Design a protein with these regions (language model features):
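Short glycine/serine-rich loop segments
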Residues: 1-65, 222, 226-245
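A short helix-breaking turn/cap at a secondary-structure junction
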Residues: 24-110, 266-288
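Short, well-ordered beta-strand elements
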Residues: 50, 240-249, 256-260, 264, ...
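Short amphipathic alpha-helical coupling segments at ligand-binding clamshell hinges
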Residues: 57-61, 111, 187, 240, ...
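Short helix-loop capping/hinge segments that flank enzyme active sites or metal/cofactor-binding pockets
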Residues: 87-96, 142-195, 232, 236-243
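Acyltransferase
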Residues: 106-131, 152-160, 184, 188-205
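Short connector loops at secondary-structure junctions
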Residues: 125-140, 171-173
Length: 288
């Protein structure tokens, strides 16, 4: 039995496998866990976090691994105060209203709405509607591509990328060398503006609830560095697990974990085991 695992995420690789396997995944605030010794993909977006059975387990693992070790210059030691007995009703909570209202192609919408009802009616959480900044987030996706090309430059120039398993990544690494420096710099300038707008959204709340696979949350928060906790909240008719997410303010990992923990006290989806023969769900919004 595996008690926990450690994942790395650049754009979905903690939240996506956690969802697919019916477990709880915590992608921390950027810089809260040292990445020393881990393979780089995007220096400005890579994050390391726990993947566990429950939010409380994630909190315990995170408490052990967070902080600077002097080997990763982006890592910071910021106090992490985990109290599973704190009243979750003291949190200022929002929900991504527009994302929950979009019915088209939203096959797990009823499960997500049931989670919102449980938060309100069973736990007593008061939630206010919030919206992500209206911004062309997709236009900044090539930041990851450019940084991945830099991270794997030696592999590409040596020709050893031909030894990789057949996929799109070798060509991605090669073509990244054609991205103009001006475009990369301007994309990061736009990213900084987006971070400022996102901070305004979080100004009056500690955490917001959002669909994991809709609303652009995964891509947006990996650009801004905000923490996200994805927890199981139901299954498809075929037995495929689904999840819902809790996004915290910067360095408010404890708050996001607390709200996730509170929901897991009134539900048992995190204790169930997915059917290993279940059909896989469609690919999430970018998973690296």
């Amino acid at each position: 039995c595996v008690g926990f695992s450690i994942g790395t995420e650049t754009r979905g690789s903690i939240t996506s496998p956690s969802t697919r396997n019916g477990i709880t995944g915590h992608r921390p605030t950027f810089g809260r866990v040292s990445r020393a010794g881990a393979m780089a993909l995007s220096w400005s977006m890579d994050k390391i976090g726990p993947m566990c059975r429950s939010a409380e387990d994630c909190a315990l693992v995170f408490a052990a691994i967070h902080g600077s070790d002097g080997l990763d210059p982006t890592a910071r030691t910021v106090p992490f105060s985990w109290d599973p007995y704190r009243d979750p009703r003291t949190l200022r909570v929002g929900y991504l209203a527009n994302a929950f209202e979009q019915a088209s192609g939203y096959d797990n919408r009823e499960l997500d709405l049931a989670t919102l009802r449980a938060l309100r009616e069973e736990i007593g959480i008061e939630m206010v509607p919030v919206e992500l900044p209206d911004f062309p987030v997709g236009a900044m996706n090539f930041i990851l591509t450019a940084e991945a090309g830099a991270a794997f430059e030696e592999l590409t120039l040596s020709g050893r990328d031909d030894l990789m398993e057949n996929s799109s990544w070798p060509n991605t690494f090669r073509t990244s060398r054609l991205i103009p420096a001006v475009d990369y710099i301007n994309a990061n300038r736009a990213r900084t503006i987006y971070m400022q707008h996102f901070s305004e959204v979080m100004r009056d709340i500690d955490v917001f609830v959002a669909p994991t696979r809709r609303g652009g949350v995964v891509g947006a928060t990996n650009l801004t560095g905000h923490p996200q906790v994805a927890i199981p909240n139901g299954f498809s008719e075929q037995g495929t697990p689904y999840s819902i997410s809790f996004v915290g303010g910067l360095y408010k990992d404890a708050e996001a974990l607390l709200l996730a923990h509170a929901y897991q006290q009134v539900s048992d989806f995190h204790l169930r085991h997915p059917d290993i023969d279940a059909q896989p769900m469609p690919q999430e919004e970018g998973s690296q």
